[in-house]
């Protein structure tokens, strides 16, 4: 009996060490047979006491993990789990769209995984997103700038536990709201490499898809985008331009003419799927909906056998939600314009790929083109189509600051609408080839 406290302490040490160091996942419920790639999951503690525990999924490159680039993938939201990227956009697995029957939903292999040519860390952030959690009540409200520092610390600690990847070329990547986080993170890493942190992270650049960049610009370009896509009439477009004077979403309440015209605009567009105007605005609980796998994800990941397989800490969170901050957790959006970070990163010489699904109404490609133009870098390669098997997959332009802009034809707010095309675009760019 006297040895019981020592055994308990030893057990706690083993559990904490096991969680923090990462665990290999060889099988996943819903997938037949062993996984055809190397998956590791785990937590990295943040802060002096490491009370914040950030959860990650790490997948090794299927080609040459010792030399291939190391990517960090952040999903948007803020507060959406990175498994959104893994299972819906650029990972090696996807949920099979089959009517839910009470059993664990099925997983299938994909042909468009970015892990074919890169090692990828899919990180659940901020605190409370996915399986990331805090052991103690938070004193400060999570924020953009706070998460940038947390993610930087995560990377330093993760690489210290995985030193074999320290020399791999590193790229930060993400989409949607990550457009606020990734550019600031790149700047933070760059500064840290010179000031505080050894060994330095081998930072080479960043990748962003349909990035939220400057709320006012992103929103205001929805009007010209809607006109160009024939969603509103010429007459409404000319009237709204004249009476709103380019400010469509933060309208002076005294400007009644503009308010009425904006109301007419919403009548024409509110029933659309704003994430891809070509896709139906459907109920995700319906098996006929393109996004039905999102509904299945909740059943899959909340199944106890799945959480056990992923080595999720049982005392961490209750029911998993794909996006948390939009619903119930306070968050301080203290970066309202990430353009200055892009400018600083350009000056530092980092490569960047900025891509836009050209049927996204949330962050229209026109808005992204506008802020890129505001950087005032000269054009190296003029606007041209990029091709896949003699077919136009989108259009691209490159700039003197090592920035490549590309559209993905027919795609929407995220890569899931055209995953094969987005993968080929990524594969060419990350290899240093022209699109």
Swiss-Prot record:
Expressed in roots. Glycans are attached at residues 101, 313, 336, 344, 376, 420. It is an enzyme of class 3 (hydrolase). InterPro entries: AB_hydrolase_fold, Peptidase_S10. Residues 1-21 form the signal peptide. Its main location: secreted. Belongs to the peptidase S10 family. Probable carboxypeptidase. This is Serine carboxypeptidase-like 12. It comes from Arabidopsis thaliana.
């Amino acid at each position: 009996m006297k040895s019981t406290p020592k055994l308990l302490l030893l057990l706690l040490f083993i559990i904490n060490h096991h969680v923090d160091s990462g665990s290999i996942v060889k099988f996943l419920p819903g997938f037949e047979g062993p996984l055809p790639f190397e998956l590791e999951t785990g937590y990295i503690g943040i802060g002096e006491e490491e009370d914040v525990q950030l959860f990650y999924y790490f997948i090794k490159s299927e080609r040459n993990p010792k030399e291939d680039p190391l990517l960090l993938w952040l999903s948007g939201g803020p507060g959406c789990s990175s498994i959104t990227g893994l299972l819906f956009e650029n990972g090696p697995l996807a949920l099979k769209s089959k009517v839910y029957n009470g059993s664990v939903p099925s997983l299938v292999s994909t042909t468009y995984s970015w892990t074919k040519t890169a090692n990828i860390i899919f990180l659940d952030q901020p605190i409370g997103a996915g399986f990331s959690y805090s052991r103690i009540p938070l004193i400060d409200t999570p924020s953009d700038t706070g998460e940038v520092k947390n993610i930087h610390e995560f990377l330093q600690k993760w690489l210290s536990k995985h030193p074999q990847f320290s020399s791999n070329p590193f790229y930060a990547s993400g989409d949607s709201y990550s457009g606020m986080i990734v550019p600031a993170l790149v700047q933070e890493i760059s500064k840290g490499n010179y000031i505080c942190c050894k060994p330095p992270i081998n930072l080479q650049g960043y990748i962003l898809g349909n990035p939220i960049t400057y709320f006012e610009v992103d929103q205001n370009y929805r009007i010209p985008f809607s006109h160009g896509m024939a969603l509103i009439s010429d007459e409404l477009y000319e009237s709204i331009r004249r009476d709103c004077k380019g400010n469509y979403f933060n309208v002076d309440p005294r400007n009644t003419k503009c308010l009425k015209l904006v109301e007419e605009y919403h009548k024409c567009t509110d029933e659309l799927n704003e994430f891809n105007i070509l896709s139906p605005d459907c109920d995700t609980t319906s098996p006929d909906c393109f996004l039905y796998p999102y509904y299945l994800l909740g059943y899959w990941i909340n199944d106890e056998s799945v959480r056990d397989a992923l080595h999720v800490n049982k005392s961490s969170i209750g029911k998993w939600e794909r996006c948390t901050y939009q619903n119930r957790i306070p968050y301080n959006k203290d970066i309202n314009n990430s353009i200055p970070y892009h400018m600083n990163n350009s000056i530092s010489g980092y490569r960047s790929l900025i891509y836009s699904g050209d049927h996204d109404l949330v962050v229209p490609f026109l808005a992204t083109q506008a802020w890129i133009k505001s950087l005032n870098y000269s054009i190296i390669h003029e606007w041209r189509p990029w091709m896949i098997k003699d077919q136009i997959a989108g259009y691209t332009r490159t700039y003197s600051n090592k920035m490549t802009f590309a559209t993905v034809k027919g795609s929407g707010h995220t890569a899931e609408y055209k995953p094969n095309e987005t993968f080929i675009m990524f594969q060419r760019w990350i290899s240093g080839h022209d699109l």
